[in-house]
Amino acid sequence: MIDQYKHQQLQIGLVSPQQIKAWANKNLPNGEVVGEVTRPSTFHYKTDKPEKDGLFCERIFGPIKSGICACGNSRASGAENEDERFCQKCGVEFVDSRIRRYQMGYIKLACPVTHVWYLKGLPSYIANLLDKPLKKLEGLVYGDFSFARPSTKKPTFLRLRGLFEEEIASCNHSISPFFSTPGFATFRNREIATGAGAIREQLADLDLRIIIENSLVEWKELEDEGYSGDEWEDRKRRIRKVFLIRRMQLAKHFIQTNVEPEWMVLCLLPVLPPELRPIVYRSGDKVVTSDINELYKRVIRRNNNLAYLLKRSELAPADLVMCQEKLVQEAVDTLLDSGSRGQPTRDGHNKVYKSLSDVIEGKEGRFRETLLGKRVDYSGRSVIVVGPSLSLHQCGLPLEIAIKLFQLFVIRDLITKRATSNVRIAKRKIWEKEPIVWEILQEVMRGHPVLLNRAPTLHRLGIQAFQPTLVEGRTISLHPLVCKGFNADFDGDQMAVHLPLSLEAQAEARLLMFSHMNLLSPAIGDPICVPTQDMLIGLYVLTIGKRRGICANRYNSCRNYPNLKVNYNNNNNSKYRKDKEPHFSSSYDALGAYRQKLISLDSPLWLRWNLDQRVIGSREVPIEVQYESLGTYHEIYAHYLIMGNRKKEIRSIYIRTTLGHISFYREIEEAIQGFSQAYSYTT
């Protein structure tokens, strides 16, 4: 379909019977209206021409050959004379044969039929709106039981039966024959509702706004009750609250989309264009046909049988009519979803029929096979690798992909900045990879997000926005924390990169799709950007340290030389390397020693720490207290060391740690400070 902005789009939803007729009906010059498929036949066995009013009728779906009618007459398609658009003899329109790819027909059902997607789907929309159990609705649809229509203006047989139960008991011998008389048809049509018609009546009587109001009132009452202490009652109350929320959302959606609930029950069944369900003739008189045609034939045959019985309702038993209605319902269910009734329907060769749902869904379905996965402009594709130096909202684009994606923007800026005079020279500069090209490319990329997508896109986190940066090589660099949303890993997975062009698309990418704004799962609300796999192993290796314990070095290693740089490469100090643990006054000194290869990531060391009240006020008992000749002392604990003067004042604190712990702590501290600055800026 085409919207008001002339954008082509595909929309799946409910339509009214009037819209289905409008898709199919055509008015012939003689006043006849064609569009209804009434016969299950396809092609004539002698002439191999489509049967009139059949599933391949040329009057309904258009000519097989462009500009040639069923009679063999021809006329140039698109001629100006409207009186000659249709053949006066056969009624076929002189148009291009491609019309058979989109011209639809319809089957007028003799009884209403529920749409199986909305009845048996999870959740069941029909059961949700009617607030009734699904099993009861299924029993009503398939004729297992009926219900009495409410009637307030006049007494009915069913109502009087409750008032005169004793009198009726004495007349049982005369009441039973009544149900086999012609008068029962009138009684049934007036007072008894069964099948999908009963569902349609109930849906038509619904007031969606009242449903929303009543559901909201009931939800508030359940919310005010709180917990009763009974686990079973609390569970039922919780399930009921979830159901009420879902019911309100569904009713609101029907109101917003201008869809009537009774449209979930079909009175007209659309017939697909014949080119989408072809019949192919092969050598040796072999015919290959789509399963959809066979399912349509079954629907038409059963529907015609039901229409015949309804015309002779005075002679047809009520049970036979109800049984035929059930057969029509099952035939339509099989057409829409073959496995909806449990075991899928099979043909004479024990092969499962492929229904409309089977044609649409899955990897080989119409959408993913034909419509999706095609090449589009301003896009690229490459293998993803880990980018540990990237921020959460960044991705690394190879130079080749970046220059191809942003080529038009680079050409525009080259001409605007008078670095070149025309497009041809600008393309030559790009091809020759001049330095000014990379400068402009980085400037363009700085303000333009890109979209990364990994197939299959099963939820909205399968495509996210990132700020691109240039990287060497031919792979896309990705922050490891965003992999869970994409369900990606770095074992050869590929991702596609797309460039949003319009200002609306760029604004949506920045406001809604950036990776740092999608930290929680949209389904359950749990954090989705959490360390996994390689990150956990790296953090473990970084912070494991050497678990030799403080007692291995008599607690006081190098205490007299706080900033001593130990030469581990000197063989004479091998004993010193084993026993002595260096002291550092700051983390920068420790990092400097690591860069000089004096210590390793997991080597224990003593780091001077700020006076911390948590340490000072701790009730932990020191392992050992050492006093020196000048009156100073050292209180040695399991993981820290307190140095004091002769006045019992704490002079400094050293903690026992490793360089891996220091690096991890600094990263967390910088992240918290950056978050605090960003939060204060936004507020």
From Swiss-Prot:
Entry cofactors: Mg(2+); Zn(2+)
Residues involved in Mg(2+) binding: D489, D491, D493
Residues that hold Zn(2+) according to the record: C69, C71, C87, C90
GO molecular function: DNA binding; DNA-directed RNA polymerase activity; magnesium ion binding; zinc ion binding
SMART domains: RPOLA_N (SM00663)
Keyword vocabulary terms for this entry: Chloroplast, DNA-directed RNA polymerase, Magnesium, Metal-binding, Nucleotidyltransferase, Plastid, Transcription, Transferase, Zinc
Pfam families: RNA_pol_Rpb1_1 (PF04997), RNA_pol_Rpb1_2 (PF00623)
Cofactor: record remark: Binds 1 Mg(2+) ion per subunit. Binds 1 Zn(2+) ion per subunit.
Any one GO cellular component localisation term in the record: mitochondrion
Class of enzymatic activity (EC top level): transferase
Taxonomy, superkingdom: Eukaryota
GO biological process, one term: DNA-templated transcription
Localization terms from the record: Plastid, Chloroplast
InterPro entries from the UniProt entry: DNA-dir_RpoC_beta_prime, RNA_pol_asu, RNA_pol_N, RNA_pol_Rpb1_1, RNA_pol_Rpb1_3_sf, RNA_pol_Rpb1_clamp_domain, RNApol_RpoC1
Catalytic activity entry: RNA(n) + a ribonucleoside 5'-triphosphate = RNA(n+1) + diphosphate
Family according to the record: Belongs to the RNA polymerase beta' chain family. RpoC1 subfamily.
Function, in words: DNA-dependent RNA polymerase catalyzes the transcription of DNA into RNA using the four ribonucleoside triphosphates as substrates.
Record-given protein name: DNA-directed RNA polymerase subunit beta'
Annotated source species: Triticum aestivum (Wheat)
Encoding gene, per UniProt annotation: rpoC1
